[in-house]
């Protein structure tokens, strides 16, 4: 029997009391005018949650699309992220992001990665880059800085009014435990944005975050070319049975698991498709849960932060 699709309108609550739409538009790898068109399409289609980052180099396009959409700013949940070369100056970095976005504030500001890149290795004054050492490795600094120091600075930002909440991204359970137990910690992160999809379900991390009142956000929810979920036989069979597209199946699985989902696309039809969900049967839901158990887990995004252990 065909499933009944509907636009997702579900809202989750941050530990600040703020409301966050469960499905948002991701803009990673959306370049220049593509990002503008994607955000404009999304907002006109009813999205009210847009996720960007300084390192995406598209904040100006995202901000212009928000302005041109005609949707009141207070109706849109906007997230951006602190890049790793600016861990020592998050307020300066946030000011720069706000200037590029053309906004007075963002709703959520995330530490993009727990590792700091040493700005001493930056070339051509390009702060939004991945500086490398002479041997070509990332200029990761674990000697002079750590993410706890970054968090101690970030947790003061909501008081400025420049962001309504702060959180983290790509944090493992161990790194979250270290942050929460640190002497200078006064604020539990509002969110932890991590890679999640049926080949990397992150059950333990999701449960830990929920136990601490941290909202989980899923990036790369449809996998990528390295994790071709939309061609998985289990996904295709469920899609065929319910007369929906494979993307509907995967996004609906995420939504039923109860966290924020951030599908990325610059294709207008896919942007609209990614907000349409249906209720999976218990049998189908469990079948998707079992994909990683049968095939093994596969991470799509795994940059080398050596010697820092990001995912342990």
Swiss-Prot record:
Binding site for NADP(+): 220-274
Lowers pKa of active site Tyr, annotated site positions: 81
Binding residues for substrate: 112
Predominant subcellular localization, coarse grouping: cytoplasm
Subcellular location: Cytoplasm
GO biological process: arabinose catabolic process; cellular response to oxidative stress; D-xylose catabolic process; glycerol to glycerone phosphate metabolic process
InterPro entries: AKR, AKR3A, Aldo/ket_reductase_CS, NADP_OxRdtase_dom, NADP_OxRdtase_dom_sf
Active site: 56 (proton donor)
Reaction(s) the record says it catalyses: glycerol + NADP(+) = dihydroxyacetone + NADPH + H(+)
Upregulation: Expression is under the control of GAL4 and REB1, and is both positively controlled by galactose and negatively by glucose. Also induced by salt stress and in response to DNA replication stress.
Consequence of changing residue 267 to Q: Decreases catalytic activity
pH dependence: Optimum pH is 6.5.
Keywords: Cytoplasm, Glycerol metabolism, NADP, Oxidoreductase, Phosphoprotein
PROSITE patterns, A to Z: ALDOKETO_REDUCTASE_1, ALDOKETO_REDUCTASE_2, ALDOKETO_REDUCTASE_3
Phosphoserine modification, residue list: 306
Domain of life the protein comes from: Eukaryota
MF term (GO), any: glycerol dehydrogenase [NAD(P)+] activity
The keyword Oxidoreductase belongs to this UniProt entry's keyword annotation: yes
Pfam families: Aldo_ket_red (PF00248)
Known EC number: 1.1.1.156
Phenotype upon changing residue 270 to H/Y/K: Decreases catalytic activity
Recorded GO CC terms: cytoplasm; cytosol; nucleus
Family per similarity comment: Belongs to the aldo/keto reductase family.
Entry protein name: Glycerol 2-dehydrogenase (NADP(+))
Organism from which the protein derives: Saccharomyces cerevisiae (strain ATCC 204508 / S288c) (Baker's yeast)
Gene that this polypeptide is encoded by: GCY1
């Amino acid at each position: 029997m065909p499933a009944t699709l509907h636009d997702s309108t579900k809202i989750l609550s941050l530990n600040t009391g703020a409301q966050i739409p469960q499905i948002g538009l991701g803009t990673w790898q959306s370049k220049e005018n593509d990002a503008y068109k994607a955000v404009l399409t999304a907002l006109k289609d009813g999205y009210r949650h847009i996720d960007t980052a300084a390192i995406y180099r598209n904040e100006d396009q995202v901000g212009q699309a928000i302005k041109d959409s005609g949707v009141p700013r207070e109706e849109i949940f906007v997230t951006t992220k602190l890049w790793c070369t600016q861990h020592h100056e998050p307020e300066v970095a946030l000011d720069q992001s706000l200037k590029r976005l053309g906004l007075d504030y963002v709703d959520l500001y995330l530490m993009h990665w727990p590792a700091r890149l040493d700005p001493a290795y930056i070339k051509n004054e390009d702060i939004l880059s991945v500086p490398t050492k002479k041997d070509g490795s990332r200029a990761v600094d674990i000697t002079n800085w750590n993410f706890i120091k970054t968090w101690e600075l970030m947790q003061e930002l909501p008081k400025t009014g420049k962001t309504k909440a702060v959180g983290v991204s790509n944090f493992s359970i161990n790194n979250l435990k270290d942050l929460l137990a640190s002497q200078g910690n006064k604020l539990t992160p509002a969110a932890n944005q991590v890679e999640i999809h049926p080949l990397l379900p992150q059950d333990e991390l999701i449960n830990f975050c929920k136990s601490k009142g941290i909202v989980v956000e899923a990036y790369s929810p449809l996998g990528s070319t390295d994790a071709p979920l939309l061609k998985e036989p289990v996904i295709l069979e469920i899609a065929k049975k319910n007369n929906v597209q494979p993307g509907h199946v995967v996004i609906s699985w995420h939504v039923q698991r109860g966290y924020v989902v951030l599908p990325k696309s610059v294709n207008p039809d896919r942007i609209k498709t990614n907000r349409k969900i249906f209720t999976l049967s218990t049998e189908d839901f469990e079948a998707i849960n079992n994909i990683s158990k049968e095939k093994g887990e596969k991470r799509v995004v795994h940059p080398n932060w050596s010697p820092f252990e990001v995912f342990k």
